[in-house]
């Protein structure tokens, strides 16, 4: 579960490395956000690259929206089958719910693909 002030890894090539959660937007429960939920984040650390377009560049301190891709808590599927990840990861999205980066790094759970 992701709560406020949780530090998360960014799993796309938008330029951000670490982000911190500042608000839970579309949470499936009152306890915290899980896989597939939308949160508001602030960029804590980024990579400066010279070949990134200015529209796709993410700066430190910038507030963005993100969708949760993986959590350490995991996802329960039918038959008591749990899927867990080794880190909490997000992908940055814009106001039209399109990803800022052009690639997603690492596995993406099936629950995200069916809900979106």
From Swiss-Prot:
It holds the Pfam family Ribosomal_L14. CDD domains: Ribosomal_uL14. Gene3D superfamilies: Ribosomal protein L14. It is found in: Mitochondrion. Keywords: Mitochondrion, Ribonucleoprotein, Ribosomal protein. GO terms for biological process: translation. InterPro entries: Ribosomal_uL14, Ribosomal_uL14_sf. The keyword Disulfide bond does not apply. Belongs to the universal ribosomal protein uL14 family. One of its GO terms (molecular function) is structural constituent of ribosome. Transmembrane segments: none annotated. It comes from the Eukaryota. One of its GO terms (cellular component) is cytosolic large ribosomal subunit. This is Large ribosomal subunit protein uL14m. Its main location: mitochondrion.
């Amino acid at each position: 579960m992701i709560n406020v002030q949780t530090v998360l890894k960014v799993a796309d090539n938008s330029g951000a490395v670490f982000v911190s959660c500042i608000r839970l937007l579309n949470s499936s429960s009152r306890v915290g956000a899980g896989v597939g939920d939308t949160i508001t984040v602030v960029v804590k650390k980024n990579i400066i690259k010279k070949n990134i377009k200015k529209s796709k560049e993410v700066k430190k301190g910038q507030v963005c929206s993100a969708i949760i891709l993986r959590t350490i808590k995991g996802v329960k599927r039918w038959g008591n089958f749990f899927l867990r990840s080794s880190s909490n990861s997000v992908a940055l999205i814009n106001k039209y719910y399109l990803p800022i980066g052009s690639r997603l790094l690492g596995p993406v759970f099936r629950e995200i693909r069916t809900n979106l």
